[in-house]
Regions:
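Hydrophobic alpha-helical segments, chiefly the membrane-spanning helices
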Residues: 1-323
Length: 323
């Protein structure tokens, strides 16, 4: 029965992602917002809902390893797994402004989380405290404000001759209510389907006696990132690879700054199962994204390298679990 549910949930994931991206593209055309910003603000935040749910429940149950491990693992999978898979089939192109702001911002919050979690500033036990969380929440608000402000400034700088093209895009977008319905409906189907998938996968893993830290870094992290994977592939299929990148970067920032920021307000997140290696791999993932994207394009072979890094990290976790 579990296998039937897994197959049905995968079908739901595919259809939900397609509707979510289609609706998001229409909204982007209506408001003349860049694909990257829509990917970060609507798709990235929306598809991170499963991560928020898992981390909140982990915090409420006093299981910081699940709360933090879910975010760290998801962020690693987002870059190495999702962008790796997407770039292998569809080279990901994006604007140089994203290389100057959003991606470095993502590197910065990843480093900051590591410093907070390892208590670099006060030298006590590994813990993301309430003050740390408030700082992270403020950083998320700053990121969203700057993203939309910079995008608006860019639009105002567009030359007059490009306006007709933008208007034609807006006309093709269709009624706004249909776009909003697609986003809400697609996101609902996507999250529900992913929830079914993760629940079944975790039950199977626990039957083999796997610990919480390992499950949160692998099965839960990858499972809750399935919406991002499906949305990124759907965006790439629609020739919106910039939206796919925005989805990943926005999701990573949202996961750290808002999800862990809010979760730490429920209870300080003291974690011992998530190691320095896990945080280092998370930082290395976004640094690799910056390095590969210096020419504003992630090539197919670079996608292969990213995905191989994910396989290597997963193998490390498996061998460490066995040991």
């Amino acid at each position: 029965m579990e296998y039937v549910i897994l197959i049905l949930s995968l079908v739901g994931i595919v259809f939900g992602a397609d509707y979510l991206v289609a609706g998001s593209v229409s909204i982007a055309r209506k408001f003349k917002v860049s694909d990257f910003v829509i990917g970060a603000a609507i798709i990235g935040v929306g598809t991170s809902t499963p991560e928020m749910t898992v981390s909140f429940i982990g915090a409420l149950n006093g299981n910081a390893d699940v709360a933090i491990g879910n975010v760290v693992g998801s962020n690693i999978f987002n870059v190495f797994g999702i962008l790796g898979i997407t770039a292998m089939f569809f080279p990901v192109t994006f604007d140089r402004q994203n290389l100057k702001f959003e991606i470095p911002f993502c590197v910065g919050v990843s480093v900051l989380l590591t410093l907070f979690a390892l208590n670099f500033f006060n030298g006590t036990a590994q813990c993301v405290g309430r003050v740390d969380g408030l700082i992270l929440i403020a950083i998320f608000a700053l990121f969203m404000w700057l993203s939309f402000a910079r995008d608006k400034k860019q639009r105002l700088q567009v030359s007059a001759e490009s306006v007709p093209a933008e208007e034609s895009k807006t006309e093709e977008a269709g009624p706004m209510w249909k776009a909003v319905l697609k986003v809400i409906g697609g996101l609902a189907v996507l999250i529900f389907s992913c929830d079914l998938f993760v629940d079944n996968a975790v039950v199977i893993a626990k039957s083999f006696g796997v610990n919480d830290a390992f499950i949160s870094l692998t099965l839960i992290a990858c499972g809750t990132s399935l919406p991002e994977l499906a949305a990124s592939i759907a965006a790439a299929l629609k020739k919106n690879t910039s939206m796919a990148l925005g989805n990943v970067v926005g999701s990573n920032i949202f996961n750290i700054a808002l999800i862990l920021g809010l979760s730490s307000q429920v209870t300080p997140l003291t974690s011992t199962g998530i190691t320095l290696v896990d945080y280092a791999v998370m930082i290395a993932a976004v640094v690799a994204l910056y390095a590969f994207g210096r020419d504003c394009k992630i090539q197919r072979y670079e996608g292969v390298i990213l995905f191989l890094c994910f396989i290597g990290y997963t193998w490390y976790l498996i061998t460490n679990q066995i040991a």
